[in-house]
Amino acid sequence: MFNDNTNKMNRSILDIQASALVISQFTLCADTKKGRRPSFLNAESPELSKKLYEYFKVSLRKRGMLVDYGQFGSLMKVKLVNDGPVTFVLDSKQ
C-alpha cells in the first residue's frame, strides 16, 4: 500500500521496513444515521473482538513486522504521523 519509485502502490510495509501501530477501535462500527448518539449494534462482542485483536497481533509478528500495540479496550491518547493522505478500511467479511 506504499508507493514504489514509479509512484504506484506496489510496496508493502515489509518492503519499506516501516512500523505499524495497532489500536482496537470499536467506534469505527458506529452507526450515526439516527438520533443524537451513535449506535454500536454492528460492533462485535468485546470477547470475540479481543480474540480477533490478539490473533491479528500474532499474525503480524509471525510475518516479521515491526509493530507497537495499544491495550485492548482501554482509553488512550495516541500520537502518530500518518503516511497519506490515504486511508484503507480493511473488511475481513467475505
Predicted regions and their residues:
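Short, low-complexity, polybasic intrinsically disordered segments
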Residues: 83-94
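Glycine/charge-rich, flexible interdomain linkers and switch-proximal surface loops
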Residues: 5-20, 68-81
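Compact, glycine-rich, soluble single-domain proteins
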Residues: 1-17, 27-58
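Short active-site-adjacent structural elements
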Residues: 31, 77-79, 87-88
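Short, conserved loop-to-beta-strand elements that form functional interface hotspots
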Residues: 50-79
